[in-house]
């Protein structure tokens, strides 16, 4: 999963052994082959480069993407796979407890319609790491009845709390990015957990600007509505 210089690789062709070259032999020798890939690899590139992928499992532990597993089969094994579509399973373990997998296909994601929120409601949701990696962003909205804050933010909101597969927050205050508004919002806050989604500044830049230390009980999200 690393090259000879110790750098992380992001393409199958950069990895050793070269699974793309070995794939015909693998599916010839084994009816079902599971290949463990680097979580740094792009899923859509993997789908283009590997011909016999039937399933993809994206595994996260304590909200960090750890494994990208692909199941290779030369022949389709069950009627449910008759369309030849690849099933993607997002699996998350938190404190040694495995949550319910989120299973989907990319055609389902393409057809899904997720409403956009006109404003931030009572609760805010951030998808778990495996979901952010796999990208079922529209389906999350339709399956859990939540709204996206923005088409490109991947943050969701709702009036009532739902059992969402990720981090869930009760919204206490919403502020614009104006100097006066921010001063009021950050009054008495010198430490906070800061997340940036679809925003023209990095976490490091905002920490420096707002003079915030990392950690504490306050969670701040900088995003575009």
Predicted regions, residues:
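SAM-dependent transferase fold signal centered on methyltransferase-like domains
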Residues: 1-225
């Amino acid at each position: 999963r690393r090259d000879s210089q110790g750098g992380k690789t992001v393409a199958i062709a950069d990895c050793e052994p070269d699974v793309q070259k070995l794939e015909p032999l693998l599916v010839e020798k084994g009816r079902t082959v599971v290949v463990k890939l680097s979580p740094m690899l792009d899923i859509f590139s993997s789908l283009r480069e590997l011909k016999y992928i039937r399933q993809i499992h994206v595994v996260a532990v304590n909200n960090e993407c750890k494994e990208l597993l692909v199941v290779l089969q030369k022949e389709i094994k069950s009627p449910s796979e008759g369309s030849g579509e690849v099933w993607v399973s997002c699996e998350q373990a938190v404190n040694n407890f495995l949550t319910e997998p989120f299973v989907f296909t990319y055609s389902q994601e393409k057809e899904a319609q997720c409403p956009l929120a006109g404003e931030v409601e009572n609760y805010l949701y951030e998808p778990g790491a495996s979901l952010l990696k796999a990208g079922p962003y529209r389906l999350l909205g339709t399956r859990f009845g939540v709204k996206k804050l923005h088409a490109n933010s991947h943050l969701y909101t709702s009036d009532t709390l739902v059992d969402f597969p990720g981090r869930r927050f009760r919204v206490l205050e919403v502020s614009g990015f104006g100097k006066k508004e921010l001063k009021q919002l950050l009054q008495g806050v010198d430490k906070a957990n800061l997340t940036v989604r679809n925003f023209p500044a990095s976490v490091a830049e905002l920490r420096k600007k707002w003079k915030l230390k990392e950690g504490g009980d306050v969670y701040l999200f900088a995003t575009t509505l």
